[in-house]
Amino acid sequence: GNRVTCRDWFQLSLKEGLTVFRDQEFSMDLCAEPSARAVKRIEDVRVLRTAQFPEDAGPMAHPVRPDSYVEINNFYTVTIYEKGAEVVRMMQTLVGRAGFAAGMKLYFERHDGSAVTCDDFAQAMADANPASELARLLPQFKRWYSQAGTPLVKARGVYDAAARSYTLSFTQSCAPTPGQAVKEPFVIPVAIGLLDAAGNDLPLQLPHWQQAETGTRSFVLTQETESFTFVNIDAEPVPSVLRGFSAPVVLDIDHTDDQLLHLLAHDSDPFNRWEAGQRLALRRALRAVQADGPVHAPLDAPVLDALRHVLHHPTLDAAFKELVLTLPSETYIAEQLTVVDPQRVHAVREAMRDQLAHALHDDWVWAYEQHQDNGAYRPDPRSTGRRALAGLALHMLCLAARENGNPVWPGKAYQRVKDAGNMTDRFNALSALVASGQPLAQEALGRFRALFKQDALVLDKWFALQAGQPDRGGQVLPLVRQLLAHPDFQIKNPNRARSVIFSYCNANPGAFHRTDAAGYVFWSERVLEIDAFNPQVAARLARALDRWKKLAEPYRSAAREAIARVAAKSDLSNDVREVVTRALAE
């Protein structure tokens, strides 16, 4: 950004998308094992799915290169940054890593000291790689810059035993977004592998290829409907599609539970291995959300056994195991539904978490004892992973203790708050106590604050942990109001405001979406209060109700009323007015 900058604000993703991509690649390069490298990729995709995909589907949807804006502050978004990084990543996929390096070299040679556009960047990449798919498809590829929305890719596989062939058929579409009713097909690189019954990658060969290639191969979708037929396939394979999350799309693929269990156990692509576990859990969560009556244990024995197997796997990275054993978030579950009852979603996910804590209790004990870090602190990826898995195990053991009354694990967590040799372990232990509603949590919170009350960033974490805790009976909103009155809380400090207000309104749906609408009243009060002195922060908070039209009643009407209450204020900033006006637009 210092050597080559943006010609105008519409080109913001030119440097911000590239910066995010560079950071992602650097972080992955610090890791050794493929499953450790995949941890960063998975974390980035979780942000896309829980923040950017909803933005693409909501009233503030905009292309990576917006066409217009009321207030530029509202376009420092996950679309500009994170989706922008995915566009850069797809370029790298289409030209290869060496080709991407050549493209960057040409870009800087051409434009050093200049203010340029997204088109200039894409052109440099294509010109440095004239024989690449990117160069051939450049005008169509640039639709990623001009079209808003998340493409939906449907994949269906058919095996022909007589011909010893397997055909994967793809259909791409993209829903209308504000101001863009019709979408043209995108260029979508889809990384594919096929697994045999033993879990090995099969050699991939199309009819016109001279020889097969084993492992992952990228195929490029450019039309609404396309098919690829693989030959010399002796038995029906299990497809592993969109490996490494090769494009920012929603994948609809008709895997059976057995196929997903096979991928979870064997897929050589760590991302899709994690994805198989998420799909198994998500499938059960949605089934439980849509069922009538009380929520019963949603996870069945095959899934629990598969997760147990991952936990004990001898070669998988500990950080990767922690991600596989972490259930899909309430936000992600809700995004899969047409109509959302936030309290039902919250109840289902809590039931799944409690079930996982109890069913794998002895395994969590093993995981904690094997991975707790009592030696000198080391910031390397392997040690980071061990701390993450030990933290999840302690969290689960404190959850189980809440039900069975066993004081041992809450006691160990409290001791860890007192004597941990690093912040990660100390905060994980505090989180385990707070999230499981343990009586020791209050004492631990007091001790933690006493230790770190001079450190503003740590105190932000302390506030956020309390405002973001699971709601058990409506206690979180009164607590949040108490935190606003805390002597260490200053609403004019953006980080402190985010730590309490955003942690509640934007990141704690089970507590925010109350049947009495008190969460929405609190939200509207805070948006108006903050708008008076910091419109940019207020506009970010205003977006907590972007997806109000998906809500079931009584939430939907109450949310609309709260948004209208904000919109009715005569002296709103442009920042907030743009957000609430677009939210209310039919």
Predicted features along the sequence, with ranges:
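Beta-strand-rich binding/interaction modules
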Residues: 133-139, 150-241, 286, 333-334, ...
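Structural beta-strand/beta-sheet cores of well-ordered domains, especially the beta-sheet scaffolds
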Residues: 10, 17, 24, 86, ...
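Long, ordered, helix-rich scaffold segments
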Residues: 50, 77, 231-586
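Structured loops at beta-to-helix junctions and adjacent beta-edge loops in soluble globular domains
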Residues: 24, 67, 91, 171-173, ...
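Short, surface-exposed helix-loop/turn micro-motifs enriched in polar/charged residues
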Residues: 6, 10-14, 100, 113, ...
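A general structural signal for short secondary-structure junctions and capping/turn motifs
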Residues: 10-11, 54, 79, 145, ...
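Hydrophobic alpha-helical and helix-loop surface patches within well-folded domains
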Residues: 1-158, 167-170
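His/Asp/Glu-rich metal/cofactor-coordinating catalytic motifs and the adjacent surface-exposed loops
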Residues: 117-139, 144-172, 183, 281-285, ...
